[in-house]
């Protein structure tokens, strides 16, 4: 409901305090125009509250659906995790690792010979770096630049 149309809403305080002072017509009845206006305001207010209630119900349903979807996703994730653990327990990881290593070996073999020499120098450098970190070997001896670059 628009906030600029507050004159069209009947507030609960007006209902409880009976602030509707209808003018009386000549026959000791109330003015038909004012009663009509009041009833229009009442219908407008009730329509507004009904729309609010419907929106609230829709949001509540959407919220519950969101949690149902989340629960389904969590169930799928746990099922996939169990299947993945089963694959790894059955040696799937070893087969995957072996196939990756074989693919890399095939790729290295297909490189030109100059590339293979460079890869061998890089491999030698990495072995020395690893040995330095594990055994404390000094990397500064010898022609370090000449060996690798």
Swiss-Prot record:
InterPro entries: DivIVA_domain. This is Uncharacterized protein MG211 homolog. The lineage of its organism: Bacteria, Bacillati, Mycoplasmatota, Mycoplasmoidales, Mycoplasmoidaceae.
């Amino acid at each position: 409901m628009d906030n600029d149309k507050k004159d069209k809403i009947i507030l609960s305080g007006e209902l409880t305090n009976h602030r509707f002072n209808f003018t009386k017509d000549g026959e000791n009845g109330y003015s038909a125009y004012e009663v009509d206006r009041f009833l229009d305001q009442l219908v407008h207010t009730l329509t507004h509250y009904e729309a609010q209630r419907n929106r609230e119900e829709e949001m509540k349903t959407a919220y519950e659906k969101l949690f149902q979807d989340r629960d389904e996703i969590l169930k799928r994730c746990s099922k996939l995790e169990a299947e993945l653990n089963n694959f790894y327990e059955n040696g799937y990881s070893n087969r995957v690792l072996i196939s990756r290593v074989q693919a890399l070996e095939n790729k290295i073999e297909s490189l030109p010979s100059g590339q293979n020499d460079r890869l061998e120098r890089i491999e030698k450098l990495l072995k020395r770096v690893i040995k330095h970190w594990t055994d404390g070997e000094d990397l500064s001896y010898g022609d370090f630049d000449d060996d690798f670059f």
